[in-house]
């Protein structure tokens, strides 16, 4: 069966190339391979690469990337899984360190544009939202079985939606009559409750769908796992670069990278005000996040909320 082509623009492509330009990349990990756009650019600019480990939860994306990167088939190794498993995959092939790590946390256009994946409220499809099609939990499971309290909590914590109570209550009342099984079912149910005015910012449906997607895929949990152990495997002079797309992700990345670059450590937990000295393991390449230029946003509106942070491992 031929592999379909999906037009997908890699976000902040030039900035990613620049981020790794000073580094000798012998072993590189792409934690979110997608269609292989970033991979293609990095492999073109770094002929010294001996191993390019590409990880993605979506087997369809891996198939597309494998075809796209055929020119470098002697160097690439593709693994289906979550980016927080990078250390497991490294050890499986006999490696204990890496020179670079890239993670792009955005949902790719090819996933958003496939109605059957259930990521977008603008396209009718099953209420799924699994990055890994083999995962057990779906958005429909959450919407139809979780309590009003738990639904409200994820809408508040993962969507930062002001009307989280109303959204949860509306869903629970509606599902007593009929199950909510499609993206259109959920969107049509919540639209009247929100009465959104386009002049007043983000569509609340965007935030509700974001919250469900984060919950289904445990996105924030695995992001924390990734960043907290990255510097254990990064060689001195190596770099980690993360592209995030909403404040929850960026907050985790910012805090973890700043902690790695800090010479202080809170001894009894966040906010305690009690510190002890520690040796920094990294330096921040950019203290403020890099954002897309107006030209890129115009060409690819989905890039508008991207934030790019980079850190470099210090000598031991």
Swiss-Prot record:
GO biological process: rRNA base methylation
Reactions the enzyme catalyzes: cytidine(1402) in 16S rRNA + S-adenosyl-L-methionine = N(4)-methylcytidine(1402) in 16S rRNA + S-adenosyl-L-homocysteine + H(+)
InterPro entries registered for this protein in UniProt: RsmH, SAM-dep_MeTrfase_MraW_recog, SAM-dependent_MTases_sf
Keywords: Cytoplasm, Methyltransferase, rRNA processing, S-adenosyl-L-methionine, Transferase
Binding site for S-adenosyl-L-methionine: 36-38, 56, 83, 104, 111
A cellular-component GO term for this protein: cytoplasm
Subcellular location: Cytoplasm
Membrane spanning stretches: none
EC number: 2.1.1.199
Main location: cytoplasm
GO function terms (MF aspect): rRNA (cytosine-N4-)-methyltransferase activity
PANTHER family documented for this protein: 12S RRNA N4-METHYLCYTIDINE METHYLTRANSFERASE, S-ADENOSYL-METHYLTRANSFERASE MRAW
Similarity field: Belongs to the methyltransferase superfamily. RsmH family.
Task performed by this protein: Specifically methylates the N4 position of cytidine in position 1402 (C1402) of 16S rRNA.
Matches recorded under HAMAP family: 16SrRNA_methyltr_H (MF_01007)
Name assigned to this protein: Ribosomal RNA small subunit methyltransferase H
């Amino acid at each position: 069966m031929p592999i379909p082509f999906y037009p997908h623009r890699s976000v902040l492509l030039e900035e990613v190339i620049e981020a790794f330009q000073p580094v000798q990349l012998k072993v590189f990990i792409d934690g979110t391979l997608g269609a292989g756009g970033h991979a293609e650019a990095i492999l073109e600019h770094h002929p010294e690469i001996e191993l390019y480990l590409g990880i993605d939860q979506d087997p369809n994306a891996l198939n597309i990337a494998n075809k796209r990167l055929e020119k470098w088939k002697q160097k690439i190794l593709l693994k289906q899984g979550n980016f927080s498993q990078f250390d497991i995959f490294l050890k499986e092939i006999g490696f204990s360190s890496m020179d670079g790590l890239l993670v792009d946390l955005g949902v790719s256009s090819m996933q958003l544009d496939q109605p059957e994946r259930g990521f977008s409220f603008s396209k009718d499809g099953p209420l799924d939202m699994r990055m890994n099609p083999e995962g057990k939990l779906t958005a429909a499971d959450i919407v139809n079985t979780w309590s009003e309290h738990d639904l409200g909590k994820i809408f508040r914590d993962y969507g930062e939606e002001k009307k989280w109570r109303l959204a949860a209550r509306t869903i629970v009342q509606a599902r007593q009559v009929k199950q909510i099984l499609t993206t259109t079912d959920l969107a049509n149910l919540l639209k009247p409750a929100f009465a959104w005015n386009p002049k007043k910012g983000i569509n609340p449906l965007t935030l509700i769908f974001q919250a469900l997607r984060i919950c289904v895929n445990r996105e924030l949990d695995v992001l924390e796992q990734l960043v907290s152990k990255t510097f254990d495997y990064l060689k001195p002079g190596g770099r980690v670069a993360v592209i995030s797309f909403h404040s929850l992700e960026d907050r985790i990345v910012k805090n973890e990278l700043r902690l790695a670059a800090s010479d202080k450590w809170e001894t009894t937990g966040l906010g305690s005000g009690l510190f002890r000295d520690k040796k920094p393991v990294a330096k921040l390449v950019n203290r403020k996040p890099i954002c897309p230029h107006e030209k890129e946003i115009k060409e690819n509106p989905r890039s508008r909320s991207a934030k790019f942070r980079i850190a470099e491992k210090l000598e031991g």
